[in-house]
Amino acid sequence: MTKKKAVRKHIKLTSHPGGDGATPIPIHWGASDPGERGPVVGTLTDSAKRNVIGTHSGSYAVYRALAVAAGVLDPQHTADLTNTSPWHSFGPHPQWFDAEKIVSIDPFGAVVNDVFRDYYKDGYDIRPSIAVTKAHLNMPELHTAIEEGRLKPDGDLLRDNGECCVTKISFEPVWYLPGVAQRFEVEESKLRHILFEQTGGMFPELVTRVDLNVFLPPIGGMTAYLFGDPGMVHQPETKLTVRVHDECNGSDVFGSDICTCRPYLVHGIEECVRGAQAGGSGVIVYFRKEGRALGEVTKFLVYNARKRQKGGDRAEEYFARTECIAGVQDMRFQRLMPDALHWLGITRIDRFVSMSSMKYDAIVRYGIEIKERVRIPDELVPEDAKVEIDAKLAAGYYTEGEVPDSEELSKAKGRKFKA
């Protein structure tokens, strides 16, 4: 018996408004009623029902395509969302309904199977873009903090075995294009054209489908870790400790000592635990922006250039080496970062565990008050990371101490490569 070949559908390289006779459900971003706002339909099971550009899972959408191509995933599979609801319900908060406060995540992304239940009955395949669960963190630095007496187990948040109990929230990026354009102070049409061109023409609908105002970009999202009662995070009387952290795989995971990323991340976690144990709450938001969003290959090229340059690895050339290779010092653009804090309902941060002027300025600019800024203790800065910390202090990062002068910046402090 011969196996019947699947018949491929005609491929449309692009689409146009009304081209297939279907009228997508409009998305009225910022509407307080989910029915009026409308669902984000980014699935591929029925293309006529889609009302966004792009698809779910961020950068992992490509792996989904590979799974379909390999024959291990049915392209018509729909998710069974039984027992997947958030273990803790967040919001709705006033920021959810302000089209200028949240532009890069779907406020209703965690509860789509509740608030859009009627659409499921009509055959719409709607996927969550936010998931909320519980987790235990087990990090050697927390064990050390307990041994040295900086933290004390309480049997609830921090256990005797060193495990820390947290609420964990994963966000996929969902961009409201008019709002993103406003954040970057460009015309929406210009943003659409440049996104299309600079991704190699990956999403022609950015140009042809001006009726679709939501884009699911193929990039990483972020994860929030909440310490203490998650229901207290948004309350005005709660003393809140926050660290916003951008991914650094080499340091965060493997302990590379050329930067302060893991030490500062762990310091932030310790401060969050301490704050929550004192009756407040703590929040760590971890963004996938490897190498200042320049990527890890670029980052490693910069490391090589720094170590091999004439005069050695020194702070005065720290940013210049990045700019020579990447054409820019930093592409993280913290303007979208406050959205996760707004989703949590945060209006004030009592202790902001960061020295970054970019992060501080973005949070304050978009309506969140910061009472106190907390720098990384000197003893936590690795020897090879002193180049980084000096360069950042000279560039305007927060400190209560002295800013390195030109003579100090010219000293080679970075480790030399051995032949």
PLM region descriptions:
Residues 1-419:
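Catalytic domains of riboflavin
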